[in-house]
C-alpha cells in the first residue's frame, strides 16, 4: 500500500500573507516611509510641547501643575494604551487602525490649537495620546509583515531611527515654530505630517 505524504503548500502561505500586503501600497519602502512619518508625528509631540509651555502659560493663564498635565496626559495615555492599540490592530486590521490613529491624532492636534482653555488642552492632549497608542503598534507590525526576512533588520532600523530623531528634533522644531509663529503651530504642524502619512 502506497503511503501518500502531504507536502506543505508554499503558495497557501504566500496567499495567507497577501491580504496584509494588499492593503498596503505596492512598494515596501513607501510603506516604511508612511509608517515612519506616523512615528515621527508621535515622537515630536512627546518633546515639542516643552518649548511651547511658557507661551501656553502666558496665553491661557496656566499654572505649573497645568503645564505638567499638558505634558503628562499625553504620555500617560500613550504608554498605558499601547498594548490595547496592538490588539485592536490585530482584530480590525493594522492599516485601518494605523490610519485611524493618524487621522485622529491630527484632528486632536487641531482641536488643541483652537480650544482656548487649559482644561481643553489637557483633555485633547490625552486624546492625542490615545490615537498615538493606536498607530504606534501598527507601524512596527506593518513593517514586519511587509518586508522579507533579509531586509527586515534594515527596515526596523530605519523605523527606530525615525522615532529617535523625532524626539530629539522636537525642541528644535518647537523653538522655531513658537518664535516665528505661535504655540498653536507646534500642534498644527501635525496636519501636513498626517496628510503625508495617509497619502504615502
Q: What is each model feature region?
A:
Residues 2-200:
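Transmembrane-helix bundle of Major Facilitator Superfamily
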Amino acid at each position: 500500500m502506497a503511503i501518500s505524504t502531504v507536502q506543505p503548500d508554499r503558495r497557501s502561505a504566500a496567499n495567507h500573507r497577501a491580504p496584509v500586503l494588499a492593503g498596503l501600497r505596492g512598494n515596501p519602502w513607501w510603506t516604511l516611509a508612511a509608517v515612519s512619518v506616523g512615528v515621527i508625528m508621535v515622537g515630536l509631540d512627546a518633546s515639542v510641547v516643552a518649548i511651547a509651555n511658557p507661551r501656553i502659560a502666558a496665553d491661557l493663564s496656566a499654572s505649573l501643575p497645568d503645564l505638567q498635565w499638558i505634558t503628562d496626559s499625553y504620555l500617560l495615555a500613550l504608554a498605558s494604551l499601547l498594548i490595547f492599540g496592538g490588539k485592536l490592530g490585530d482584530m480590525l486590521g493594522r492599516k485601518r487602525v494605523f490610519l485611524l490613529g493618524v487621522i485622529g491624532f491630527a484632528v486632536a492636534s487641531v482641536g488643541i490649537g483652537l480650544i482656548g482653555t487649559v482644561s481643553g488642552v489637557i483633555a485633547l492632549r490625552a486624546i492625542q495620546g490615545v490615537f498615538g497608542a493606536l498607530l504606534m503598534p501598527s507601524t512596527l507590525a506593518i513593517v514586519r509583515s511587509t518586508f522579507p526576512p533579509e531586509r527586515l533588520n534594515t527596515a526596523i532600523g530605519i523605523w527606530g531611527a525615525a522615532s529617535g530623531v523625532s524626539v530629539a528634533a522636537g525642541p528644535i522644531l518647537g523653538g522655531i515654530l513658537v518664535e516665528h509663529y505661535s504655540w498653536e503651530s507646534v500642534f498644527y504642524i501635525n496636519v501636513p505630517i498626517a496628510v503625508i502619512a495617509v497619502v504615502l
